[in-house]
């Protein structure tokens, strides 16, 4: 038993590497039932009539891409499939490229036209000040879009003057922007808000769910996988759940087995 306690850590790393690689090669899907938190966002979007306006804030950067980009893509598929007009923006300077590529690629897949069915406003610094400005007049906050076009005559923004005119707003965040959207957006201008975040932030968002300040929550890769399942379009998030789940099981086994060996060795001594 003492030999097992002194096992080379490189052997453990090899087991973890195998636990990641083998599920990717075999490509098996684990069941991903949707939780009520994720279903809250799905049901809200599904209830919107055609032609509704939805704002998606891509408030994350490439460091959080693996968790949040699948959420963004799944949301966009749902919106474009339901003929909802999408307005994108970001309060994170690292999110512009990710947001633009996601909106453009998914929009083309559904034959949607830029300025007619969707628009990307781009990045603006200020966070809370930007939200307050958008709450008063969106054209004052973003007189031009990401590509330099004037926003005042865009069909995708017809009927939208401020945040209050959006039928739904979703913030995808790798930082503290969700709290800002609640305090300086929803509570001040009274619109429906949903949220997506990295797994490490997820537990901090549940009080906002319980207080009904957000309609729903997608947390981490699991949240993205649940949304992919709901829209019946399994992609990178669902594929990533298999290796993640196997690694989690392996780590739990190592912890239990290591503690068992430690106590058994102590009893012998």
Q: Where do the model's predicted regions map?
A:
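Membrane-proximal low-complexity regions enriched in glycine and acidic/polar residues
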Residues: 115-199, 203
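Structural recognition of alpha->loop->beta junctions
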Residues: 101-128, 211-229
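Short extracytoplasmic
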Residues: 42-70
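C-terminal functional extensions of proteins
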Residues: 3, 196-269
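Short glycine-rich or small-residue beta-strand-to-loop segments that form or flank ligand, phosphate
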Residues: 54-61, 86-90, 169
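Alpha-helical transmembrane signal-anchor/signal-peptide segments
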Residues: 30-47
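Membrane-embedded segments
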Residues: 63-119
């Amino acid at each position: 038993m003492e030999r097992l306690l002194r096992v080379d850590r490189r052997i453990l790393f090899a087991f973890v590497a195998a636990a990641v690689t083998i599920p990717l090669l075999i490509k098996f899907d684990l069941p991903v039932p949707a939780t009520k938190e994720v279903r809250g966002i799905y049901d809200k979007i599904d209830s919107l009539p055609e032609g509704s306006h939805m704002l998606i804030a891509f408030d994350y950067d490439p460091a959080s891409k693996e968790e949040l980009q699948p959420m963004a893509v799944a949301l966009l598929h749902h919106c474009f499939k339901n003929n909802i007009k999408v307005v994108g923006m970001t309060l994170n300077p690292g999110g512009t490229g990710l947001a633009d590529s996601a909106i453009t690629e998914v929009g083309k897949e559904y034959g949607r036209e830029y300025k007619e069915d969707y628009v990307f406003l781009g990045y603006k610094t200020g966070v809370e000040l930007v939200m307050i400005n958008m709450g008063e007049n969106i054209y004052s906050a973003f007189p031009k879009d990401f590509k330099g076009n004037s926003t005042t005559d865009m069909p995708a923004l017809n009927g939208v003057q401020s945040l209050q005119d959006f039928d739904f707003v979703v913030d995808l965040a790798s930082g503290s922007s969700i709290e800002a959207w609640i305090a300086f957006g929803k509570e001040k201008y009274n619109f429906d808000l949903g949220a997506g975040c990295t797994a490490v932030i997820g537990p901090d968002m549940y009080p906002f769910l319980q207080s009904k300040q957000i309609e729903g929550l997608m947390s981490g890769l699991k949240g993205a996988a649940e949304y992919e399942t709901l829209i019946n379009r399994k992609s990178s998030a669902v594929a990533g759940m298999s290796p993640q789940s196997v690694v989690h099981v392996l780590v739990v086994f190592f912890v239990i087995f290591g503690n068992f060996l430690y106590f058994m060795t102590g009893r012998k001594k």
